[in-house]
Structures are given as C-alpha cells and as structure tokens.
C-alpha cells in the first residue's frame, strides 16, 4: 500500500476521480491501481470561489510500490498501525475511578489484558443520565450526581463528540478505531476534524462498557471515591460511597480519571496531602451566531453544500495586554447547553448532534488566565475562582439555573441587554437578560471585548451585534494538575496511584484523555509482569 498526500479533490468526487488523481500524481496508468481509500480529508476553503478537499489517499498497486514511491514526491509506503495488547500478570485487580474517556479506555485495555478491573463512576449510566440532563434542561431541577459533568462517558458525552487532538501519540489512531468498532461512523478515521455527535456517542459508550463487562470487568455506577489509604507511600485501599453506605476496596493500583469537575475529590486529595498544583486554564462565555451566516462567511457560494456540512472555525488572537483570546469547542449547527453540576452555580458548554443542522452555531470564547491571576497561591485557587464566577452567573440568571445572556453589541457597550436580534439563545431551561461585564473581572471582560473585535476582522460577522453571549464558560479544562512521575505515570508521592486524563491535568479533550487512559493502563500491565 502506498500513501499519497496532497491530492486535491472536488466536493463531488467519486472513486473514479480519486483513481485518476492518484494516477496523475504517481505518474502511472489508472489500470495499475487495484484500490484506493481516503486516509485523511480536510476542507481547503481559503479561496471562497474554489473550495475543495485536500486529501491523503492509500492506494494499492499491482506494480512495484517501492519503485513508484522512490520516484514521486508526497508519497510513502503505508504501514498499518497494530496495537500490541499486553497480558496482565500476577497482581490484584486494578480500580479505575471515573468513566469518562480516560477511564473507559483504561478499563477497556485492562479488561482485554485479563486484569478484571473495577470501574467506578459517581454518576449514572448514560441512559439514566440523559433523562436526568433533559429534565434539568426543561425544568431547572439539577441532580448534582447525574448531569452534564458526571455520569457514563464524562463531560464529553454532552458536547459535539469532537475527536480532533493536538497529540501526536500513535495511540490516537487506536482510539479512533475503537470508536468505529463500537459503533461510530467510519468517517472519523479520515476526516481532519472528526466528530461523532452527542446522539451517536452515547451508543458507542454503552458498547465499550458492555465489552468491559463481557471480558470480566465490573462497572459500578452511583459509586463515589471518598477516601484512600496509604502505607509507606504505597496505595493499599480506597473507600467508596454507594447507596448502601461506605465500602472499602483493597487494591494496590488505582487510575484516578476523575474529570475536570470533581471538585470535592480535588479537595479530598488536597486534604490527603497529595502534591497538587494550580495550572493555567481559560474562562469566558459561549458565543452564538446564526449557522447560515457562519456557513456563508466560511464557504461563500458553497454554503449549504451537503458535502461540506455546517462550517467550522477556529480563531485566536494575542492582545496588547499580553493575554490570548481564542475560540474553543466550536459546535456547528449545535446548541449552548447548561453544564451546571453544583448547587447555586451555573456554567455552560456547547453540544452538537451528528447532523449538525440546528439553527445556530456556537463556540466558547475564552481568555487565557494563569495562577498569577488567582486570588491566592492555594493549589485549588483556580477552582475557587471558577466557583466564584459560576455563583455570580447563577445570581445574574435569576437564581433558578436560567443562564445570563447578552447581545454582543450590548456587551461591547457595557449595558444590560433588553431585547434579542435575529439570534435566539438555544440554552435551557431558559435565559435572563444580563450584563456579563458585571460577572467577569475586568481583565477577562475587556480581553473578551478586544478579542471579539479582532476576530470580527478574521471571520466576517463574528462581531455581529446580534450574536449572543451566554455565561459562563469555566470548565474548558482542569484548574489543577495532580503531580505524577514521567516514567511510571504514578503519583510523585504514592506508588500505585495514577493521576490520569483531563481532570488530573494531562489531557484536553476526548482523544488525548483516552490516550492517557491507555498509557496508564499499559503502565499497570507492565508492572504486573515484573
């Protein structure tokens, strides 16, 4: 198999046109090609009058591929990625805390190794969790144990199911292939910006859970980690809380994949004197535009083409005050969702289903902050800042989980909104007109305002006065890092404890978290064979 990059294909390409383009680039006859398959595909929309797919194609030839590869640029012999699944040795079963991407993939790899892992999750299974979330979005009745942050699949379950990642780790291919084998669409294997969609992601998560159980693993929902026991700096046991009371599980290996919103667990770890440090993260709001306007701005006359789907964007700018402002977790044809998980505190996120065909498109508009901005040097100071702003958002929304919203024009002019334009907020249970400038510290609100203006020059209409801001977006990443060793991935203090994934500060998104879960599982398997 030969891999050919930099192949330009029209939006209506078919197998015949792919073969023709590959033959031309390889300078061979079409009949020398046995088969072709898209390996990677992205949209090149830099010229609005000539939008095309930029692709990498795997081609099987019936002539000597090595010779062809040597004489042509942008080619290489394609090597199929094969994951080496190790077997578990003679050791007690491990426990994984948290059933987000990191925890699920750690449990899957451990189950396949024969480790019979226990996976505990403080929230509910994805079906009951979905019912709880939908009830909250319609009635405003929050369940602090089952919500957008807690439950099977983690916080990413109620997002766009975005699978793009900055990590170059080869295991990311493994993650994508596992998603497909458990029910995700094949296109995530080749799209440069793959996504599953919230609707499809739920079924995929259940299928992963079922395989873990079939292989001898145990999955416990509504089960919360409340304490751990150590001896001679080694993990000996954990205490869990269930509906039947507390229970002690003796184990010497625990993967701590708790997610970025397990604040009570962060406090428990701090009380146990585990080394934790405050880390930089970002705060801002969701910004919502009409999908058709974003599509037009990105795709010009090609807007609405079903091959392109709803348009994406990713913007960032550096301000004179030294801060970075950027968009994050863009949800084309999606909705803004109420992602609250604590009583009397409110935060937001974005979500799309696979079709991405809702009326609006949205993204997080975030300002980078660092520990120098926090109100103290406490390791959990970033978390306390999150809580403070979420409490102010809750009050601004009317103290009933309605979200505070504001038109961009009003935000830029520091006045409370009193009416809507052509963009209707999509968040539930409802919204309240507000002035977000009164929620954020000045350094955040002024940076957001400057960012909106500068990004309006990058993407036509981004600074539309009728665009809607919904606050606050405070959970884009973890505010802490649980310190671990670079070689064993264990806590720098406690042997057998593996801080893992986004909540521990070692990932940012579904793919990188899943990869980190796999890496932690591998370390436990390696140790079991010593």
Where are the language model's segments positioned?
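Residues forming the flavin
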Residues: 1-53, 57-158, 162-530
